[in-house]
Amino acid sequence: MNNTGLSVKKVVAIGIGSAIYVILARFTSIPTPIPNTNIELVFPFLAFFASIYGATVGFSVGFIGHALSDFIMYGQTWWSWVLATGILGWIIGLAYKRLDLKNGIFGLKQIILFNIVQIIANILAWIVVAPIGDIIIYSEPANKVFVQGISATISNGISILIIGTILLKAYASTKIKKGSLRKED
């Protein structure tokens, strides 16, 4: 029987990841001069979870975590950015099998792949999805939302590049590499 649903492990990862997302979003945002745009240290964590558990978990943690954190902190949810966060997690999560973290592999090739994917994901999320959503849903001025999107792309891309890479390297180092165990004579 082919089970196409979510595993218990992934459902638990979504719940725990969303809760951690809310806490990090609340306490690790660094304001920027661009209105309503922060350096978000939660995005390396989202990239970390997406890289370990895949696209569905990445999307779900980003979407649920962002929606809850917006509602808790501001009393309302900014849906265009919530969707963009989910898409960011989803795109990064698409590469999780190629990263091969479960086998303890995160060398230069995987670091480059991870960062190319996360940069593309940031561009699509913050320069395409979020600004267009802001214009369509909230009738925001285009020049404002694209400046916010570019600022978010740069700050999130850099934070994921540095912190996300460190988190994934540390995680991979805790895994036993395939073929590293040998039977003693």
UniProtKB/Swiss-Prot annotation:
| Family per similarity comment | Belongs to the UPF0397 family.
The UniProt transmembrane annotation reads 11-31, 45-65, 72-92, 111-131, 146-166
Q: How does it sit in the membrane?
A: Multi-pass membrane protein
Which pairs of Cys residues are joined through disulfide bonds in the record?
A: none
Q: Which organism is it from?
A: Lactobacillus acidophilus (strain ATCC 700396 / NCK56 / N2 / NCFM)
Cite the HAMAP family for this sequence: UPF0397
Q: Where in the cell is it found?
A: Cell membrane
Q: Per the record, GO CC terms?
A: plasma membrane
UniProt-listed Pfam families: ECF-ribofla_trS
**Plastid: present as a keyword of the record?**
no
Q: Keywords on this record? A: Cell membrane, Membrane, Transmembrane, Transmembrane helix
What PANTHER family does this protein's entry cite? UPF0397 PROTEIN BC_2624-RELATED, UPF0397 PROTEIN SPR0429
Q: Which InterPro entries match?
A: ECF_substrate-spec-like, UPF0397
Per its record, how is this protein called by name? UPF0397 protein LBA0922
